């Protein structure tokens, strides 16, 4: 199912179509200042400041991150700490988990660190949210939404800064020792995006189970 907050509903689409036939939408469009397509989340492709393929990758990452932010934008601290059952993860913990996984791939692809050679400082900061489970259930709580958004933003800013230093040859470089088999940096960072998409689905499910949650069409 398409994200309902990203794409128009059938009813809204029909309304828009009717407006177009009368020329009203054209007048509205003409009255708006022009926007650069480079800033549109719905344009996947090269972006200024990056090599062609890295820019395309960042556009996919930005679209997915926007979907996550849409999912959590109205959540209170109580919502973020909500535990569905004794083995579930909270939404707050999942948000830190996203940052932890991205930080791991920073260490791996930017600094050449494998999973068994991570610095102790990294393990202390990110080990628990990477693994989740009982330690995360006990420790990752009591924070408002801004706390989690700042963690995500700081991590993403580092990723983008490092991407700007690199080219498509780096993106295509193959790690022959990766556990999945020969894997290039492009695949690793696409996995970061895919991983975020999976957890966004989990976040939406948990939202639907919050006390007092209204039925959703997502």
What are these regions (language model features)?
Residues 1-8:
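N-terminal secretory signal peptides
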Residues 8-9, 18, 38-47, 58-69, ...:
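Short, contiguous alpha-helical
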Residues 10-29:
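N-terminal export leaders
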Residues 43-52, 134-138:
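Acidic/histidine-rich, surface-exposed loop or edge segments in extracytoplasmic proteins
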Residues 51-58, 80-82, 91, 139-147:
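Second-shell loop/turn segments in exported
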Residues 73-78:
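Extracellular-facing binding/remodeling surfaces
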Residues 128-172, 188-192:
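Acidic/histidine-rich alpha-helical segments that form the ligand environment
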């Amino acid at each position: 199912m398409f994200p309902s907050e990203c794409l128009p509903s059938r009813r809204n689409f029909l309304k828009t179509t009717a407006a177009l036939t009368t020329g009203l939408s054209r007048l509205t469009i003409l009255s708006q200042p022009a926007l650069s397509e480079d800033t549109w989340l719905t344009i996947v492709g090269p972006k200024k400041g990056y090599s062609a393929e890295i820019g395309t990758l960042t556009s996919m990452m930005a679209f997915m991150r926007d979907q996550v932010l849409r999912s959590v934008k109205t959540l209170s601290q109580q919502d973020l700490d909500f535990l569905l059952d004794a083995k579930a993860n909270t939404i707050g913990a999942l948000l830190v988990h996203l940052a932890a996984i991205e930080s791991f791939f920073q260490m791996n692809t930017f600094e050449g660190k494998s999973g068994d050679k991570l610095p102790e400082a990294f393990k202390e900061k990110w080990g628990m949210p990477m693994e989740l489970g009982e330690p995360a259930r006990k420790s990752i709580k009591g924070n408002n939404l801004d706390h989690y958004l700042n963690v995500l933003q700081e991590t993403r800013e580092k990723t983008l800064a490092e991407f700007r230093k690199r080219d498509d040859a780096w993106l295509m470089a193959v790690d022959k020792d990766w556990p999945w088999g020969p894997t290039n940096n492009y695949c690793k960072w696409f996995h970061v995006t895919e991983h975020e998409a999976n957890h966004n689905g989990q976040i939406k499910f948990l939202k639907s189970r919050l006390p007092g949650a209204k039925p959703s069409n997502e």
